[in-house]
């Protein structure tokens, strides 16, 4: 279990027991379950992406309320691509380097990146997919403010390509200490997506 992560929150709809069982098994296999807590996802039938965005917003508010130094947020379709020893090693490399960070993505689909002086880390300029990411407590307010702005507009317009949580955050990425581990430690599982209301084949 990584001592570098204060808390792990996994987001799961009440009606997706299948996903709950899968993510909880992932966490148990990785010896992370004792540090994890389930967040009851906000259910917006027919507007899954709206519920998703509000869920991420509420998780960040919850992390702030609990004064966690950081939080690893996982969606319930997250699956690890590495074993627990590799994951622990990659986290240890990152945290022992004492790199000032706002967000560190462990799962991602990157459109634009820059190299860093660290072989285990890349600087994110533009990336999406919010299935697995670590947020530092000093950055909670910044993302909370952004999501509080975007979520109502998303609900009204359904312009998800602009206002969904993993799209709107692209406004912050270039100028923030926003990183991704060079080793992609996880991805979204393929399966039925409540956000898209259809089967999704996921490769990232």
Name each model-derived stretch.
Residues 1-74, 78-204:
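An acidic/histidine-cluster motif and surrounding catalytic segment
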């Amino acid at each position: 279990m990584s001592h570098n992560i204060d808390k792990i929150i996994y987001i799961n709809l009440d009606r997706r027991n299948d996903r709950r069982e899968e993510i909880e098994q992932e966490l148990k296999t990785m010896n992370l379950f004792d540090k994890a807590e389930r967040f009851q996802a906000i259910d917006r039938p027919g507007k899954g992406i709206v519920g998703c965005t509000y869920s991420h917003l509420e998780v960040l508010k919850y992390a702030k309320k609990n004064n966690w130094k950081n939080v690893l947020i996982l969606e319930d379709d997250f699956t690890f691509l590495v074993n627990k020893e590799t994951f622990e090693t990659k986290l240890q490399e990152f945290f022992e380097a004492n790199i000032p960070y706002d967000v560190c993505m462990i799962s991602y689909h990157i459109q634009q990146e820059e190299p860093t002086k660290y072989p285990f880390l890349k600087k994110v300029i533009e990336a999406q997919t919010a299935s697995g990411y670590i947020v530092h407590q000093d950055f909670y307010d910044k993302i909370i403010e952004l999501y509080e702005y975007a979520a109502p507009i998303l609900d009204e317009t359904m312009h998800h390509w602009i206002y969904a949580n993993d799209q709107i955050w692209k406004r912050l990425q270039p100028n923030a200490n926003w990183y991704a581990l060079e080793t992609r430690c996880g991805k979204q599982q393929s399966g039925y997506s409540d956000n898209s209301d259809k089967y999704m084949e996921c490769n990232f």
